[in-house]
C-alpha cells in the first residue's frame, strides 16, 4: 500500500500496551468521580492509541501549536480517554485524571476549550464532524498546510442529521486531509444503535457521500495502523467495529452500562486483569509535525476606508452588510464568508465576487454552516462571517449554543428579520432571533438601522470576542448617520431630541425609521419625543437609556419588529427595573403573522408610525 509501512511487532505491542493503559486510566477516573462513561472509552482505546501514538503529528507539550494535526472527539462523553491520552503524552499529570468532573479541575465531564488540547466543546452529539470539516477546509484552502484533521464519532450520534450535512460538505469540497473514525460499538445510551454492527451499511452510506470508507477491527492496532495509512486522496471514514466496554469482564457488549462508572471493588479487579496484559511501561513519544502553517494575525482588522454614504439616500441594511463585508475583506485575507445558499438575498455574494477564494458555500445546511465556521475560527486562523435569513439560524441554535461553550469567535448575520419582509409570510420572518441570540453567553447583538451603522457593525464584529449577531432588514431605509459617526459596542445614539420631549421612543432597524416618521407627525401636534437607536441590543446602553427616560418624565416606549418575548422591550425593561419613576410601554408583534405588504403588516401588528403616535399620545394623556 502506497505510503504505508507496517509497524514492527515491538511497536504494535507498545500500541496495545498504550491502549490498555488508556482503558485503565478511564476506569480509574470515572470510578473516582462516581460518574462518567468508562464503557464508551474502552471501545475506543485502540483507536486513540494508534491515532495519538502512531498516526498523528503534534507537539505534546504545545497542544494548540498551529502546525499540529487536529483531533475532535465528537463523542464527547468519552472525554476520560481523551484526558488519559494527554496524560500518556506527558501534557497532563497522571494524578490530575483522578480529579475528573470535580469543580476544582479543568477536566469537565465533556471536553471544553479551557483544556489547551480541546479546540471545540463537544458532548451535544452530532456536531464534532462539522467543526472538523471547518478545520480541514481551513488547512487545505486557507493555510495550505500539511496538518491533518481527525474526528471520532460514536455510532449513536450518527443518527443526527448534522453528521450527514458534514459528510456531504467534506465530499463536495474533497477534504482529503480529513479522517472520520466511526466507533461502531453497537450500543447507544438506552438501546442498541439502529444498525448495530452492520458495518457494510455504514460503508455504503459513507461512500455515497464521496468518502473513502475502510472497515476495520477497531481493536486491532495493526488494522488501524494500516487503515490510517490508506487515508489519502479523498475524505476517509474508518469504520471501526468495536465492543462497548471492551476489556471489562461481564460488561463488554452488554446493555444498561452506558454512563455508569464501575463500583470500586469491580474496578480494582478489572484494572488488575487489564494490567496483566501490559508487557511494558515504556511510553511512545509523539511524532512532531511538519512546520508549514503560515503565521496569522487577526487582531485589529479595520476598514480600509470610511463609509461612503449620503444622508437621505436609501439602502437596505442587508445590502449594506454585503458591501461592508466585501470591503473588510480587503483589510485581511483571513476574513472569510459562509452562506447557506442565500447569498443573493443576504448580499454575501458581493464578498464572493471580490474574494471568491474566501467564500464557502455551505448550501441549505445551516446547522453545519455554523459548525464549519466554528472549526474555521479555531486557533485564530480565520474571522468567519456566516449569513442566511435570521429565521433559519433558529434551527442551528444548539450549534450556536455549543459555539459559545467553545469560546468561539464567529459572526452571524441574519437578514429578512420581522414582518417587514412582507409577502413571503411567517415562515421566512425572524421574530424570535433577538431572544435566541440574547440568551447566548457572552454574545453581542447588533441591530443597525442604516448603511453607516451596518458597516460599523461589521467592523466591530470582526474585532469582538464571542458570538456576534448582526440583524439586517429587507426594506430600504434612509441613511441617517454621517460617514464619520463613531459607533461602539454598547453605545446607543440619540437620533432626535428637543428640550421639551415627553416620551423616549426606542426602535431599531425598520421601527427606528417608523419612530422618526411618528416624531414628525407628533411635532405638528406640539408633542416632542426623543428617539433612541440602541445599535446593540446586547449590551444595551443603560446609562443613556436612563438619562433619556429621566429627561422625558420616566416614559419609555419600545417598538420592535419582533415578538414581545425576549426582544428589545424586555431587554430595556431589564436594564431599567428598579429605577423609580421609569415605566416601559412595549409595542411588538403579538401573534403569528401572515403575508402582506410590509406597510400593511407593520400597521396590522401595531408597530408602524401611526401606532407609535397613538401610544405616545396615550402616555402623555395619562400624565
UniProtKB/Swiss-Prot annotation:
Record-level Gene Ontology MF annotations: calcium ion binding; carbohydrate binding; magnesium ion binding; monosaccharide binding; protein homodimerization activity; thiamine pyrophosphate binding; transketolase activity
Binding-site list for substrate: 37, 258, 318, 345, 416, 424, 474
Modified residues (N-acetylmethionine): 1
The reaction(s) this protein catalyses: D-sedoheptulose 7-phosphate + D-glyceraldehyde 3-phosphate = aldehydo-D-ribose 5-phosphate + D-xylulose 5-phosphate
E.C. number(s) listed in UniProt: 2.2.1.1
Assigned GO CC terms: cytosol; endoplasmic reticulum membrane; peroxisome
Note describing how the cofactor binds: Binds 1 Mg(2+) ion per subunit. Can also utilize other divalent metal cations, such as Ca(2+), Mn(2+) and Co(2+). Binds 1 thiamine pyrophosphate per subunit.
Keywords linked to the UniProt accession: Acetylation, Calcium, Isopeptide bond, Magnesium, Metal-binding, Phosphoprotein, Thiamine pyrophosphate, Transferase, Ubl conjugation
Cofactor annotation: Mg(2+); Ca(2+); Mn(2+); Co(2+)
Chain positions of site Important for catalytic activity: 37, 258
UniProt cross-references to SMART domains, sorted A to Z: Transket_pyr
PTM sites of type Phosphotyrosine: 275
Active site: 366 (proton donor)
InterPro entries registered for this protein in UniProt: THDP-binding, Transketo_C/PFOR_II, Transketolase-like, Transketolase-like_Pyr-bd, Transketolase_BS, Transketolase_C, Transketolase_CS, Transketolase_N
Positions bearing Phosphothreonine: 287
Positions of crosslink type Glycyl lysine isopeptide (Lys-Gly) (interchain with G-Cter in SUMO2): 352
GO biological process: glyceraldehyde-3-phosphate biosynthetic process; pentose-phosphate shunt; pentose-phosphate shunt, non-oxidative branch; regulation of growth; xylulose 5-phosphate biosynthetic process
Sites bearing N6-acetyllysine, chain numbering: 6, 11, 144, 204, 232, 241, 260, 538, 603
Binding residues annotated for thiamine diphosphate, in chain numbering: 40, 77, 123-125, 156, 185, 244, 258, 392, 428
Binding positions for Mg(2+) per the UniProt entry: 155, 185, 187
Family to which this protein belongs: Belongs to the transketolase family.
Function: Catalyzes the transfer of a two-carbon ketol group from a ketose donor to an aldose acceptor, via a covalent intermediate with the cofactor thiamine pyrophosphate.
PANTHER family: TRANSKETOLASE
Subunit structure: Homodimer.
Name this polypeptide is given: Transketolase
Source species of the chain: Rattus norvegicus (Rat)
Encoding gene per record: Tkt
